Amino acid sequence: GSAKVDAYAICPCSMGTLGTIASGTMSNLIHRAASVAIKEGRKLVLVPRETPLSDIHLENMLRVRRAGAVVLMAAPGFYHQPQEIGDLIEFVVGRCLDQLGIENRLTKRWGQE
């Protein structure tokens, strides 16, 4: 890819998209961008949203992980005692931003008051 991009995120990432990326095929611009990220060693964060997971889903997640992608499940934490749905969303978004190297204050860090 000739475009200089530091990092990519696909959020949400369907299992269809994840499977396509895992197989190395490309049928749209999202698949192409993910393929370029992997081949050029750039940060790629995939945020799957589906559950339960089949063996095929798990194998595809392992394939993209081994290729260098980060698989970040859209599974919020609860230790920060969320009060609203937005708190759960911000938790997942904050984790994604962390993986992309983007500073954020969406949730309290461990040990912060």
Stretches found by the model and what they are:
Residues 26, 50-53, 71-74, 104-113:
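Short flexible/disordered coil segments
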Residues 39-95:
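Short, glycine-/small-residue-rich phosphate/pyrophosphate-handling segment
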Residues 86-87, 91-113:
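SAM-dependent methyltransferases
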